């Protein structure tokens, strides 16, 4: 098959379920639009930033590296994060990969480049600004983008071989529901990987950091939040790597 960005987009559309949702979707600006004219919610300072075209333009080279540096000693540069994602997801061959809250596609395109044959990486985000930037900067023959609500993923159970969400769960309104959805659409034997915030330190420090984060709309998750959630879901090979105020957690679905 001669893979192009256009064929990847058509394949991304064909994966959407149920059929009624797929029928109501439209191709708009180089991505699959599932939200119609609905705008992304902007209840906090952080969410407003993620829906801003100016932030989308500088996200990969300025905004995100700055955010990583603010997470403290041990934060990984973008290149190392991408390499870790590939290792944690165990990417190889013609896999289907879902990158939720993909932003401007800075991970989606890289993940897609690790795939072969009819493999595809689907970047999924609710922000029009981020999706538009992803199409502009990070389209590819195995990378396609969808705008929709990650709390209700439009895919059948066990659709994907690997699913991930990097640097976003602390911003979304219903993060645990998003993780439940990621687990649902992952096939048995597939890998899930997330990177998010981690609440560490003595109680007074946790309180100060928590209040400061909440003021701008960023959640701080307890250290055991996702390892315990994955274990409760019957997942295995659970791994956690804590770096400063960030945690990387991955697991295999049984």
List the model feature ranges, each with a label.
Residues 218-233:
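Short alpha-helix
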Residues 96-152:
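Class I SAM-dependent methyltransferase SAM/SAH-binding core
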Residues 72-93, 110:
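Conserved alpha-helix/loop element of class I SAM-dependent methyltransferases that forms part
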Residues 151-162:
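A short acidic, Gly/Pro-enriched loop at the edge of an enzyme's catalytic core
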Residues 162-174:
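A short SAM/SAH-binding and catalytic strip from SAM-dependent methyltransferases
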Residues 191-215:
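Conserved class I S-adenosyl-L-methionine
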Residues 2-50:
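N-terminal auxiliary segments of SAM/dcSAM-dependent transferases
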Residues 176-188:
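A short glycine-rich, Lys/Arg-flanked "PGG" loop and its adjoining helix->strand segment in the class I
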